[in-house]
Curated annotation (Swiss-Prot):
NCBIfam families attached to this UniProt entry: MnmC_Cterm
Cofactor: FAD
Bilayer-crossing regions: none
Protein family (similarity comment): In the N-terminal section; belongs to the methyltransferase superfamily. tRNA (mnm(5)s(2)U34)-methyltransferase family. In the C-terminal section; belongs to the DAO family.
Identification of the protein by name: tRNA 5-methylaminomethyl-2-thiouridine biosynthesis bifunctional protein MnmC
Length: 686
């Protein structure tokens, strides 16, 4: 790796006792090139940083690395994955977001994460995903425990850099669980002159021994020294202690797997992956796999992507908040921030995506919904950038039309063209990766034969076969349950008609998305969109005059202003699609459950008269049956723009055996088998 000195002005403002060297900061490469596990020839480096909350050195290091990446000269063949663990108010994270050396869009994205104050894993993908940064916000030990060990050893963390102030034994063992067997540890010495030297040295020596006990080769890092002296080898573990440490690491991993056996996170197999789809979710999955250099065959029943539920002219993108802010609300917040990032990345890559992050204004439409919104906004200390309460006057000023009620304003939200977003993601995937696309290809059956997947299809009026494929992902919206392997999935289709409203005064003054009993967008191409209807298991997708009137009524009953008279549906212009919805409103993402095997085991428990407690324990500790190599991505409901891209990224990480950018509760929330397993692990009837 190159060893290029870099002057970092941002460190000059540090307190003298905390600054490692205010005149010169060693480069990222100068520090990590000392580690053999992170050799310069390694094309994929995975490094984690765990600084103390008040440290400022990480901002300088990361800004320098991002600047290199932005030059498009340094990381052309090398992929770097950084994991950053930070408290919400960590000064170094704030310094990174405000760094003058950090270019947009990275600066903007990191600032959005800081401002949002949303705990959990935030993924940033830069320079066509050659540089990935996962920011894990919250208590570091909690965040580490919540991360699932990568199923592929080569995808585990190769090196750690942590302050002595930020490290203890519990943290070290969780770091070890997430690491490669030969991973190394850089322990940053504390140079604060105000500390007692004897006590400081004793603490450093103790931490060094704990790090070695956990199986790491430990190095000490002193940023005040020259590049050729800043890293010194503290000690390597003996062969005997290393063997004990590896046993402990495996036990920790097994303990976690056993705890969540009902939620299998099996990785994909080596080889080509087939994706059946055509909407936002499948397109983003194709892009996520292309960024990893994976070979993909993409199957779409239509002549182009984005012709089904993702074909609307405009769709609202905003979070789904709840008063208790549980896993569902938390996931939608993370997904919301990731979707915004994805859209901006595609725009920066030259793709045209009509959109406007003009904000979303949500108001109630009856007494119950008014009370619900009041409860939501008052229940949590939402960040100003996420959601804030507004009165009727403020709402009117934001909307540009008269709003007679108080509500919630989402400043970062807005609208985007789902079809354009879908097509841009597919186009970028084809540009980056090894993707073959098949259009006007209706998959009629799938089968697993000789450990491979095969597809039967109708294309150009002819029966054709495709395969073999190592992995198969069903992301085909309303056709998700068309196959024998998935026809029991607890998911339903809801028809939705979106009405197109001509732009005219005073409606054309609308400048933010309105959401109450339905939504209404600002005009694009001289049309507003409003809707949508919600009809379960509809028999057809024809235009409905009844639903057109219902959409109009929703607007006029939600808002009493004179401007609603300009909402004109007489042109009978609308678009109809079907969105797939789960009972808990969360998407389905992960291994395809084998319902026949689940049902057979359940019946066996009944026949052998297992007690409720015995049956529950069995389901809790036994890996739930799945179809090998088959995965589900669907059930995005009405907010697929918010939830779909992140679900696709998590699934791509699972397929590739990586450390997943999601906590265990969110992974359990998304699992396609959750409706059944929630009952079975409690000993209830299937």
């Amino acid at each position: 790796m190159p060893n290029i000195p870099l002057r970092v002005n941002s460190l000059a403002t540090e307190h003298p006792n905390n600054a490692q060297n205010s005149d010169k900061m060693p480069t990222f490469d100068a520090i990590f090139s000392h580690l053999s596990a992170i050799a310069s020839h390694n094309s994929h480096q995975i490094i984690a940083l765990l600084p103390s909350s008040d440290a400022n050195w990480p901002a300088a290091l990361i800004a320098e690395r991002l600047t290199q990446a932005g030059s498009k000269q340094h990381l052309q063949k090398q992929h770097l994955h950084l994991h950053l663990f930070a408290q919400h108010q960590a000064s170094w994270l704030k310094a990174l977001a405000e760094s003058e050396t950090l270019a947009s869009p990275a600066k903007e994205q990191i600032k959005a994460i800081c401002d949002a104050r949303v705990s959990g894993s935030h993924r940033l993908k830069l320079v066509n995903a050659r540089l990935i940064i996962d920011i894990h916000l919250g208590d570091p030990l909690t965040q580490l425990k919540d991360l699932v060990s990568p199923s592929l050893a080569s995808q585990a963390i190769q090196g750690w850099l942590a302050n002595t102030q930020a490290t203890d034994e519990a943290l070290i063992w969780q770091m070890a669980r997430l690491s490669q067997d030969n991973a190394e540890f850089l322990l940053l010495e504390n140079n604060d002159v105000n500390l007692d030297k004897t006590s400081n040295n004793a603490n450093t020596n103790l931490l060094t021994q704990l790090i070695i006990k956990a199986g790491f080769t430990c190095y000490r890092l002193n940023l005040s020294l020259k590049d050729d002296q800043l890293v010194t080898l503290a000690e390597k573990p003996s062969l005997a202690s290393l063997e004990i440490a590896m046993v402990e690491r495996r036990a920790l991993r097994r303990q976690q797997l056993d705890k969540f056996a009902f939620n299998p996170l099996t990785q994909g197999r080596e080889g080509e992956t087939a994706i059946i789809g055509g909407g936002v979710a499948s397109a983003n999955l194709a892009l996520s796999l292309a960024e990893r250099g994976k070979k993909v065959s993409f199957f779409c029943m239509d002549k182009a992507p984005g012709e089904q539920a993702s074909g609307n002219k405009q769709g609202a993108i905003y979070p789904l908040l709840t008063p208790e802010h549980g896993s569902l609300s938390h996931y939608f917040l993370l997904g919301y921030l990731f979707s915004r990032q994805r859209i901006k990345q595609l725009l920066e890559s030259g793709h045209e995506i009509p959109h406007d992050f003009c904000g979303v204004l949500q108001t109630g439409h009856d007494e119950r919904s008014h009370k619900r919104l009041t409860k939501i906004i008052n229940a949590q200390p939402w960040a100003e950038s996420i959601a804030r309460p507004v009165d009727a006057l403020q709402a009117t000023a934001l909307a540009g039309v008269t709003i007679e009620h108080q509500g919630i304003y989402y400043p970062l939200a807005g609208w985007v063209s789902p079809q354009a977003f879908t097509r841009a993601a597919i186009s970028q995937a084809e540009r980056l990766g090894k993707q073959t696309s098949h259009y006007q290809c209706q998959i009629t059956a799938i089968r697993f034969e000789n450990q491979q997947w095969y597809l039967s299809a109708i294309q150009d009026g002819q029966k054709v076969e495709f395969g073999p494929y190592a992995n198969l992902v069903l992301a085909n919206g309303r056709h998700l349950t068309d196959f024998a392997q998935t026809d029991h999935l607890p998911i339903s289709g809801f028809r939705g008609q979106v009405s197109h409203i001509p732009e005219r005064a005073p409606l054309k003054d609308l400048k933010t998305v309105l959401c109450a009993h339905g939504y209404l967008t600002p005009a694009h191409d001289k049309l507003h969109c409003t809707g949508a209807s919600y009809v379960k298991d509809a028999s057809n997708l024809d235009y409905s005059a009844v639903e057109q009137v219902e959409n109009l009524d929703k607007i006029r009953t939600s808002y009493g202003g004179e401007w609603t008279k300009a909402v004109d549906i007489t042109g009978h212009s609308a678009r109809v699609g079907v969105r797939m919805v789960t009972r808990d409103h969360a998407p389905m993402m992960g291994c395809a459950p084998d319902f026949e095997a689940i049902s057979a085991t359940y019946i066996s428990h009944q026949q052998t008269k297992k007690s409720t407690k015995e049956s529950a324990k069995c389901w809790q500790t036994t890996s739930a049956p799945v179809h090998q190599g088959l995965f589900i991505l669907g059930g995005l409901g009405s907010r697929g723009l918010t939830s779909g891209p992140l679900a696709a990224e998590i699934l791509a990480a699972q397929l590739c055996g990586e450390l997943l950018p999601a906590t265990q509760d969110i992974l359990a929330l998304l699992n396609p088998n959750r409706m059944w397993m929630r009952k079975l692990i409690k000993g209830k009837a299937l």
